[in-house]
């Protein structure tokens, strides 16, 4: 398997235009996804995770959101590379659903209520390959069976409201994978599901990835999911990457106060009972993510950070190299230990 990146993002800057001003939602973002690799994109709500994924798919609201700078290099199934930030909408339509698949958080909003499940899953084959409706339906039934939906042929003839939440999410995964994409973007795909179904969906995605060798960008706020499914993690805050590296290294040895705060905020089995006994509270990060229209000067995390010094408010820190594979956007990263 080639180790040339499937996705190579450099210097991505995404801007939203309002009546008053332009707001930078994603700033100077670099992400690489290799074949067969899962990279997790994590952070609180408002950190820029979903805007990054929508930028890759070129699904930003027209005339409001746009890519202002940077490149998004995709290596498609043909082996050829293309800069998604530079192509027109017609060329992008040929890539969406073909070379890139996407799974959204809420399947009921990504499935059309007036079309059957089978028709929706098979549609990318008809659009991108000119497959007949009958052949596309057969492929949809086969894939529904692969993603673990029982009685797949009958389910293919049903409508989204007739399926459970877990089945609908399996159907959206099937729709994203029907054309065998080289890259799958999963934007909070298990958040709306209960814990048992969530585990099943994660197992399914890992199984399908191992069979196809596709790369996956997994957007989530759940660090427990990251530990289970990803090899590398990218932590975002207020539109910028603040830490990135191998999951095991970042989780064992975080070098940014925000990452450390996220890890300490994770509840663990038995924590609630023990903490209640001792009269303690769950760890939280003080304050809120700042609005992108009113970012503080310097490091955006500084107002919430217990490590902050005067220099933190003066300028945005560069992404420093902790080692060859691990980076931190903190001027005091050498003093930080979990």
UniProtKB/Swiss-Prot annotation:
It is found in: Cell inner membrane. The keyword Translocase applies. Residues 10-263 form the ABC transporter domain. ATP binds at residues 43-50. One of its GO terms (cellular component) is plasma membrane. It is a peripheral membrane protein. Its EC number is 7.4.2.-. Keywords: ATP-binding, Cell inner membrane, Cell membrane, Membrane, Nucleotide-binding, Peptide transport, Protein transport, Translocase, Transport. It comes from the Bacteria. Probably part of an ABC transporter complex that could be involved in peptide import. Probably responsible for energy coupling to the transport system. This is Putative peptide import ATP-binding protein BMEII0863.
């Amino acid at each position: 398997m080639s180790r040339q990146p499937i996705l190579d993002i450099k210097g991505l800057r995404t801007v939203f235009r309002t009546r008053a001003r332009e707001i930078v939602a994603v700033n100077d973002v670099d992400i690489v996804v290799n074949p067969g690799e899962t990279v997790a994109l994590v952070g609180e709500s408002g950190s820029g995770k979903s805007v990054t994924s929508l930028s890759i798919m070129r699904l930003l609201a027209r005339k409001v959101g746009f890519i202002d700078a940077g490149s998004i290099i995709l290596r498609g199934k043909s082996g050829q590379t293309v800069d998604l930030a530079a192509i027109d909408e017609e060329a992008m339509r040929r890539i969406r659903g073909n070379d890139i698949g996407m799974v959204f958080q809420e399947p009921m909003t990504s499935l059309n209520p007036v079309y059957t499940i089978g028709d929706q899953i098979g549609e990318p084959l008809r659009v991108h390959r000119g497959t007949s409706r009958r052949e596309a339906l057969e492929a949809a039934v086969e894939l529904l069976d692969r993603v673990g939906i029982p009685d797949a042929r009958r389910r293919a003839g049903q409508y989204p409201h007739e399926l459970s939440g877990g089945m609908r999410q399996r159907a959206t995964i099937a729709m994203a994978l029907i054309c065998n994409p080289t890259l799958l973007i999963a934007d909070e795909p298990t958040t709306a599901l209960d814990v048992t179904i969530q585990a099943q969906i994660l197992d399914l995605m890992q199984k399908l990835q191992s069979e196809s060798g596709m790369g996956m960008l997994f957007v989530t706020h759940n660090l427990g999911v990251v530990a289970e499914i990803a090899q590398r993690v990218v932590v975002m805050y207020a539109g910028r990457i603040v830490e990135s590296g191998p999951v095991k290294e970042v989780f064992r040895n975080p070098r940014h106060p925000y990452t450390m705060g996220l890890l300490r905020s994770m509840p663990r089995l038995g924590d609630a009972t023990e903490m209640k006994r001792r009269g303690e509270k769950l760890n939280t990060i003080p304050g809120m993510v700042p609005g992108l229209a009113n970012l503080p000067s310097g490091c955006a995390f500084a107002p919430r950070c217990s490590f902050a010094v005067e220099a933190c408010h003066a300028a945005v820190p560069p992404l420093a190299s902790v080692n060859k594979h691990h980076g931190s956007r903190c001027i005091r990263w050498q003093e930080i230990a979990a």
